[in-house]
Amino acid sequence: MMKPFREFAGLALPWLLALGLASCAATPSRAPANLTDAKLAVGNYIDSGTYHADITAVAAPAKQWILQRSQNSPEKLAVVFDIDETTLSNLKHMQAADWGYQAKVWDTWAHTASAPAILPMRDVYDTAVARKVAVFFITGRKEFTRRATVQNLRDQGMGHFQALIVRPNDSTNSAVLFKTAERKRITEQGYSIIANFGDQTSDLAGGYAERTFKLPNPFYLIP
């Protein structure tokens, strides 16, 4: 004889509740990475020395390319460098901000002109200068930071350059459009850009460079 449902109610209700809760849980494959875990991973990437090693792994062949390409070349040669996380490091600022970004806080930091050089990339810069290859900096920084940026570059041993190209204060173009147009202008001045360095894909897309070299940047993305 089948027992009445009420005899199973005490067992069935917890099971049904558990099933309901399970069905409401986020699908792991759709959940974004945990923010705390992501911050810890970035910190470990830096503290372990892997970040520096990855930069060095980009800088070493870049130096060799500049030496090779500039050997007995009659052309007007140039290299293009991005600034933030390519030649100057903002780690101190980003760590103090717990990896967050606020425009006003960033502007204050930029005006301190205290970002240290990324040493392997300064070696690349020194190689270009020694081989009389013109250096151009093209940065997403705005015009109002120009003076501080020039001072920062000079203080960090990178004060010899053909031009520092910054974005107009009212610029709304994407990074790709802005930087591509500026590289095009450099080539129109008769230069052959033999290398373009950046930490964002948007620093390098758009052409007008024989070779591109991408530095690691796990901190932020500029589309």
Region locations from a protein language model:
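Bacterial N-terminal signal peptides
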Residues: 11-22
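C-terminal cap/substrate-recognition subdomain and adjoining C-terminal extension
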Residues: 28-40, 53, 75, 133, ...
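Stable alpha-helical elements in mature extracytoplasmic
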Residues: 51-62, 117-124, 145, 149, ...
